[in-house]
Amino acid sequence: MAGDPTAAMEDYKLLQLETATVDAQAPPLPTKTVPVFAPPLSTPPQPNELVYTKRRRTKRKAKCRCLFFTMGMFALGVLMTTAILVSTFILTVPIGALRTAPCPAETFGLGDECVRPVLLNASSNTRNISGVGAVCEEYSEMAASNGTAGLIMSLLDCLNVGDSESVMNKLNLDDTQLAYCNVPSFAECYTKGFGVCYAARPLSPLGELIYKARQALRLDHIIPFPR
């Protein structure tokens, strides 16, 4: 048996078989795994995602257009309402409400008019209405009738009776000839006559603005606005 090659071959095979059996029964040795970070691959969008993105963009554009349209209509409505209110005020405001400026010097206000008492020469022909009109033209004013002038002068006399302060001073007439005639010792006034001139009260700054607006719109022939 010592020199038999067949027996040696069989012993070698048995040794390999035993070694394989031991390796199979032994527990596996732990192995260390090293993580490998790889960038994610870009996947092409699916057809459903493309449709959803297009719909979202369309809705966003529609919302923006709707917002701009709403804001534009709101601004247009505000402008139209303001224009209507301003036009209505310009066309319907009463004239008396715009004549709030104080009367000029040497005059006093009676309602919407500014009244100016004037002295007339009795020797001349200035006591009639035409003569008073000539005097009033110097002030660019109109002459009141004799009855109206008499009532106004009587009113001034009544206001001045029993008052320590001159009515002429209160009415801004203290520097006129009429104020001097209020003194009884001033005999020259007995040869004078009295007349009354009047004019419309001046317009306030708002009245001037509305008057110019009506002139610009050429509405004077439709809605009279005497100065």
Swiss-Prot record:
Intravirion side stretches: 1-65
Residues that span the membrane, as ranges: 66-86
Membrane topology type: Single-pass type II membrane protein
Compartments in which it is found: Virion membrane
Carbohydrate-modified residues: N121, N128, N146
Keywords: Glycoprotein, Membrane, Signal-anchor, Transmembrane, Transmembrane helix, Viral envelope protein, Virion
Coiled coil: none
Similarity comment: family membership: Belongs to the herpesviridae HHV-1 UL45 family.
The protein's name in its UniProt record: Envelope protein UL45 homolog
Gene source species: Equine herpesvirus 1 (strain Kentucky D) (EHV-1)
